[in-house]
Amino acid sequence: MNQLESLKQFTTVVADTGDFRQLGQFKPQDATTNPSLILKAVQKADYQPLLKETVARFKGRALDEVMDRLLVRFGCEILSIIPGRVSTEVDARLSFDANASYTRGERIVELYQAEGIHIDRVLIKVAATWEGIQAAERLERRGIHTNLTLLFSFCQAVACGQARVQLISPFVGRIYDWYKKSAGAAWDEAANAGANDPGVKSVRQIYNHYKHFGIATEVMGASFRNAGQITALAGCDLLTISPELLAQLAASEAPLARSLDAGAARSLDLPAVNYDETGFRYALNEDAMATEKLAEGIRAFAADAIKLEQLMVAA
């Protein structure tokens, strides 16, 4: 049994890609997309017709609507291959506007429903800002399930749990990147690998908190830099993994044991934690890594959304 097969015994495997032609070989349950992944896909010759067809079909419509329709088109193609759910992201430029994020998420789901997709097969991705979390809470009350992304800190996870969102995506690799860059020449790769990886430690803390306190929100580790980060989180509810790392896992016959366990988490002695808006903003501000990576992530996704719009205009 290879490592990918072993991982599927403990964890729901999710493919992190817009390149849906790669999905079949790995047989993931779910898939995640974001503007950066869709931008990467539409620049490939295989997906140019899909871009042009969507733009031509909705010519004259507002650019933001055409972009949502393109994202939904990719999502529908993905859902024709996988048995589970696809995550589709709200424009990152709305990350600090709760009302606009809610409205955009609602529209994306309505576009899926118009294509015959059941609401339970779609997760609306929203950045885990305070405003994004409030938008997600409203969407959940409406019966629309959400995936809170760009999550780098414990306070973001706690607030998401309080809002009863469906799923969160802590970014393992980007946390690792920050600590490695900050340490500079003093960074010891071996000492910070596996269970000691700062990104892995962050997810473990969140997972243990959720399971200990019976919080139903699913934890999906994301943004991996190497297979070791993935295997160190075996047992996490879900892990979303790039095709390149899925291939590495499928090629490895090394043994894989469960690392995270809900039963063990329930027996831990952990303090109860809650955040109101003021406490959340202060806790996030106190976490330099999370503050920097959240801002950087929003800027990057927003920039790629603009590039995607430019490609649509030129198509």
Curated annotation (Swiss-Prot):
Keywords: Cytoplasm, Pentose shunt, Schiff base, Transferase. PROSITE patterns: TRANSALDOLASE_1, TRANSALDOLASE_2. Signal peptide: none annotated. The active site is at K125. The keyword Transferase applies. Pathway: Carbohydrate degradation; pentose phosphate pathway; D-glyceraldehyde 3-phosphate and beta-D-fructose 6-phosphate from D-ribose 5-phosphate and D-xylulose 5-phosphate (non-oxidative stage): step 2/3. One of its GO terms (biological process) is carbohydrate metabolic process. It is found in: Cytoplasm. It catalyses: D-sedoheptulose 7-phosphate + D-glyceraldehyde 3-phosphate = D-erythrose 4-phosphate + beta-D-fructose 6-phosphate. Pfam families: TAL_FSA. GO terms for molecular function: transaldolase activity. Its main location: cytoplasm. Its EC number is 2.2.1.2. InterPro entries: Aldolase_TIM, TAL/FSA, Transaldolase_1, Transaldolase_AS. CDD domains: Transaldolase_TalAB. One of its GO terms (cellular component) is cytoplasm. The keyword Signal does not apply. SUPFAM superfamilies: Aldolase (SSF51569). Belongs to the transaldolase family. Type 1 subfamily. Homodimer. Transaldolase is important for the balance of metabolites in the pentose-phosphate pathway. HAMAP family: Transaldolase_1. This is Transaldolase. The gene is tal.
